[in-house]
């Protein structure tokens, strides 16, 4: 599935964010709970993140051009970094509102109705996050994965808030409402930090996942048994695309056509194992001492 096809899932996230903003905002207005307010604020972050995801998926879907020969797939990492940053901002906002309420406790109202509305909003987020996570992992879209993680964080936030507000309702301990909001803020900081780390890794040309790299190495090792050699295997992940390159060493007496035919055969097998891979093969003669020495990943001019 191309990034253009993934955009409909970003629209799903936007629709879910709008629905939960209305529901959680209503729950907060009914109860006056700072915990539910923190939950509602995070839904605004969800909306901003979903809109950013849509924009970056649209950019990532653009074809390669003269200035972007490898396409625009890395645009997705800007979206996930933006989501991570927004999560951290939401955590700070929640903590600020909670600390203020801690020193100025307020009684809660219409708690039963407010909690019921919040539960409905949480179910919407849970279903949406499961859909986005499945699609994101299947098609290697860090944008959709980031959005799914964000929504799942929101679900756990809501669970904590609902439980806490319920306890306040039962016990009358007003201080518990802001304390729960502070704990929620501390919890979601971790998710935001993880998203920022993954985004930075992608922008720094991180290698493809270990299981895919192992599959490629297994294929190349099988061809070694047929008399071929390989070195300088390089991989990198760029959004939904994986880029793979290696040097294929063949007998020097082979014709270019014969070497090319073997190269095509190997590349086709790699694509069957890693369907989203873009592969570049460099042919070298086995007998050439320069070829034997040419194994450094960062070869410099002599």
Residue map of PLM features:
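Alpha-helical transmembrane cores and adjacent cytosolic helix/loop segments
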Residues: 1-211
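Peripheral (non-transmembrane) domains and long loops of multi-pass membrane proteins
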Residues: 1-12, 67, 72-75, 187, ...
């Amino acid at each position: 599935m191309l990034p253009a096809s993934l955009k409909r899932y970003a629209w799903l996230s936007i629709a879910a964010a709008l629905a939960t903003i209305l529901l959680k905002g209503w729950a907060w207005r009914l109860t006056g709970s700072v915990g539910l307010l923190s939950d509602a604020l995070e839904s605004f972050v969800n909306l901003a993140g979903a809109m950013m995801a849509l924009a970056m998926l649209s950019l990532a879907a653009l074809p390669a051009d003269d200035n972007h020969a490898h396409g625009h797939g890395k645009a997705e990492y800007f979206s996930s970094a933006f989501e991570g940053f927004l999560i951290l901002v939401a955590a700070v906002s929640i903590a600020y509102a909670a600390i203020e309420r801690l020193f100025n406790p307020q009684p809660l109202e219409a708690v039963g109705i407010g909690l019921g509305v919040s539960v409905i909003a949480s179910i919407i987020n849970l279903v949406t996050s499961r859909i986005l996570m499945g699609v994101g992992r299947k098609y290697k879209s860090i944008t959709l994965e980031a959005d799914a993680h964000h929504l799942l964080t929101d679900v756990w936030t809501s669970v904590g808030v609902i439980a806490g507000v319920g306890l306040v309702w039962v016990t009358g301990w007003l201080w518990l409402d802001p304390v729960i909001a502070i704990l929620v803020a501390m919890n979601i900081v971790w998710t935001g930090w993880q998203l920022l780390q993954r985004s930075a890794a992608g922008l720094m040309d991180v290698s493809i996942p270990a299981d895919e790299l192992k599959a490629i190495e297994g294929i190349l090792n099988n061809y070694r048994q047929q008399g071929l050699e390989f070195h300088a295997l390089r991989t990198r992940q760029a959004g939904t695309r994986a880029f793979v390159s290696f040097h294929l060493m063949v007998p020097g007496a082979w014709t270019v056509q014969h070497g090319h035919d073997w190269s095509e055969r190997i590349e086709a097998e790699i694509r069957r194992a890693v369907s989203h891979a873009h592969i570049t093969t460099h042919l070298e003669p086995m007998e050439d001492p320069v070829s034997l020495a040419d194994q450094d990943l960062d070869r410099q001019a002599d």
